[in-house]
Swiss-Prot record:
The record marks S373 as: Required for activity. F-type ATPases have 2 components, CF(1) - the catalytic core - and CF(0) - the membrane proton channel. CF(1) has five subunits: alpha(3), beta(3), gamma(1), delta(1), epsilon(1). CF(0) has three main subunits: a(1), b(2) and c(9-12). The alpha and beta chains form an alternating ring which encloses part of the gamma chain. CF(1) is attached to CF(0) by a central stalk formed by the gamma and epsilon chains, while a peripheral stalk is formed by the delta and b chains. NCBIfam families: atpA, PRK13343.1. Keywords: ATP synthesis, ATP-binding, Cell membrane, CF(1), Hydrogen ion transport, Ion transport, Membrane, Nucleotide-binding, Translocase, Transport. InterPro entries: ATP_synth_asu-like_sf (IPR023366), ATP_synth_asu_C (IPR000793), ATP_synth_asu_C_sf (IPR038376), ATP_synth_F1_a_nt-bd_dom (IPR033732), ATP_synth_F1_asu (IPR005294), ATPase_a/bsu_AS (IPR020003), ATPase_F1/V1/A1_a/bsu_N (IPR004100), ATPase_F1/V1/A1_a/bsu_N_sf (IPR036121). This is ATP synthase subunit alpha. Belongs to the ATPase alpha/beta chains family. Produces ATP from ADP in the presence of a proton gradient across the membrane. The alpha chain is a regulatory subunit. ATP binds at G172, D173, R174, K175, T176, G177, K178, T179. It is found in: Cell membrane. It is an enzyme of class 7 (translocase). One of its GO terms (molecular function) is ADP binding. Its EC number is 7.1.2.2.
Length: 547
């Protein structure tokens, strides 16, 4: 048997190698303790090094966001079921600031404000994580808003145009069609998406805040049926969710939008609606014992919305020329736009579309009040063709509204006023659109130009919308080249105008009104000159009887 020999030098070397790599440091971990948990807020003691907006982990997988950083405790907004927490539970830091996963795979999906899928279609492959609270682009990183974003709604595209990178407020009472306007805008991006051209495509993000789950499901179904879900992401924080989710939902949508914007893409974000976010933030602030201000809102509620909406921008060419267009929705009470939140958001945005319940109830939909609605970008966000035909539209409608109010008290109107009143009535009908039926820009331009030329003047008011629809079908077959020219960005040429007028007259000769009478322009009768009038001389004689 071989003799076992052990070298003392080898043993000494092995011990030296082990001791040189050994570290006597103990792992350090901050652990806090729950003092109380109620109404979605947890008070935690300890955690002296916690960061603002840091994610904290509670037992059972519940997470929270650190908000109030006080000397002896931390106020935490619980994102989950706070009823699972109890006094004495341990709380651990994660070291991560609030962020969500982002990526191309989020298109067509429904997620919560943490980026987790809630549509039952499985996990989503993310490209990276993006912090929710990011600094908005600086002044030097932006460029002016000059590229139109067509909504498909004539009243908006003609009078209050929206450009890529703009923030346009949609404001009005409940049940006035605010969501319908935004959904139509999403549907109108389908044609651009199908081109496959990155410079034309618009990715859409719909942020649902405090809505019923059934309403969100119905919206998703509408987008899917119309073929718009493939380029849309829905961020949902329904009414049943905790206030923390409703507060964070818009920031989650903005983070996802910024990811695509910095890749050079164009994004449309709809916040439906920021009134509910402000109410959720008010509830959180009051529960955190922050001092209340006007209408019990905290002092930084303006900053809440300004730092969110300032993230909408058109980036400079050096940064890829991407854009975020924001359509925030605000709900008013009794058309009161002077309330705290409406005035805040009006001062932040680049214009507003004001929807009025009286117009909505009269069947004028979208119920846009032209006098109050405005776009601070204006004609810069319109094509040349639209700018030319829509130049006087706002003034014509304003004059019609004044004349309409006067006509209710005046019995006799002169011929010019009657003509203006009748044309205004037809113009109002022309601007009415059905829900989920956006109209391409070339169709809008042709309709508005023909209206300005008086093509609708002798069409009965109740037949105007049907006349327009059937006229476009006819022109699509007989003047298709005109549509193609306008879609390519060209203005209406003299030749195109003659083609449209001739085709319209031909269509009128065959159009039947509701009562079955044809619509034909009566030829004007020219007055004869004095020399052309045949004069008859009449001789009157009186017979005198003889006596």
């Amino acid at each position: 048997m071989a003799e076992l020999t052990i070298s003392s030098d080898e043993i000494r070397s092995a011990i030296a190698n082990y001791t040189s790599s050994y570290s006597a440091e103990a792992s350090r971990e901050e652990v806090g303790v729950v003092i109380s948990a109620a109404d979605g807020i947890a008070q935690v003691s300890g955690l002296p090094s916690v960061m603002a907006n840091e994610l904290l982990e509670f037992p059972g997988g519940v997470i929270g966001v650190a908000q109030n950083l006080e000397a002896d405790r931390v106020g935490v907004v619980v994102l989950g079921n706070y009823e699972l927490l109890k006094e004495g539970d341990q709380v651990r830091r994660t070291g991560d600031v609030l962020s969500i996963p982002v990526g191309e795979a989020f298109l067509g999906r429904v997620i919560n404000p943490l980026g987790q899928p809630i549509d039952g279609l499985g996990e989503i492959a993310s490209e990276e994580d993006r912090v929710l609270e990011l600094q908005a682009p600086t002044v030097l990183e932006r460029q002016p808003v000059e590229e139109p974003l067509a909504t498909g709604i004539k009243a908006i595209d003609a009078m209050t145009p929206i450009g890529r990178g703009q923030r346009q407020l949609i404001i009005g009472d409940r049940k006035t069609g605010k969501t319908a306007v935004c959904v139509d805008t999403i549907l109108n991006q389908k044609a651009n998406w199908e081109t496959g051209d990155k410079t034309k495509q618009v990715r859409c993000i719909y942020v649902a805040i405090g809505q019923k789950g059934s309403t969100i499901a119905a919206l998703r179904k509408t987008l899917e049926e119309q073929g718009a879900l493939e380029y849309t992401t829905i961020v949902a924080a329904p009414a049943s969710d905790a206030a923390g989710f409703k507060w964070l939902a818009p920031f989650a949508g903005a983070a996802l939008a910024q990811h695509w914007m910095y890749q050079g893409n164009h994004v449309l974000v709809i916040y439906d609606d920021l009134t509910k976010q402000a109410e959720a933030y008010r509830a959180i602030s009051l529960l955190l014992r922050r001092p209340p201000g006007r209408e019990a809102y905290p002092g930084d509620v303006f900053y809440l919305h300004s730092r969110l909406l300032e993230r909408a921008a058109k980036l400079s060419d050096d940064l890829g020329a991407g854009s975020i267009t924001a359509l925030p929705i605000i709900e008013t009470k009794a058309n009161d736009v002077s309330a705290f939140i409406p005035t805040n958001v009006i001062s932040i945005t680049d214009g507003q579309v004001f929807l009025e319940s009286d117009l909505f109830n009269r069947g004028i939909r979208p119920a846009i009040n032209v006098g109050v609605s405005v776009s601070r970008v204006g004609g810069a966000a319109q094509t040349k063709g639209m700018k030319k035909v829509a130049g006087s539209l706002r003034l014509d409608l304003a004059a019609f509204r004044d004349l309409e109010a006067f006509a209710t008290f005046a019995s006799d109107l002169d011929a010019a006023s009657k003509s203006q009143l009748e044309r205004g009535q037809r113009l109002v009908q022309l601007l009415i659109q059905s829900e989920n039926a956006p109209q391409a820009v070339e169709y809008q331009i042709i309709s508005l130009w023909l209206a300005g030329e008086g093509a609708f003047d002798n069409v009965p008011v109740e037949d105007v919308r049907r006349f327009e629809s059937e006229l476009h079908e006819y022109l699509g077959s007989n003047a298709a080249q005109v549509y193609e020219q306008i879609a390519g960005g060209a203005q209406l040429s003299d030749e195109s105008k003659e083609t449209l007028l001739k085709a319209t007259e031909d269509f009128k000769s065959a159009f039947q009104t509701t009562d079955g009478t044809p619509v034909i322009n009566e030829p004007e009768v020219e007055a004869l000159d004095a020399g052309q009038v045949k004069k008859d001389q009449l001789t009157v004689s009186r017979k005198v009887s003889k006596k």
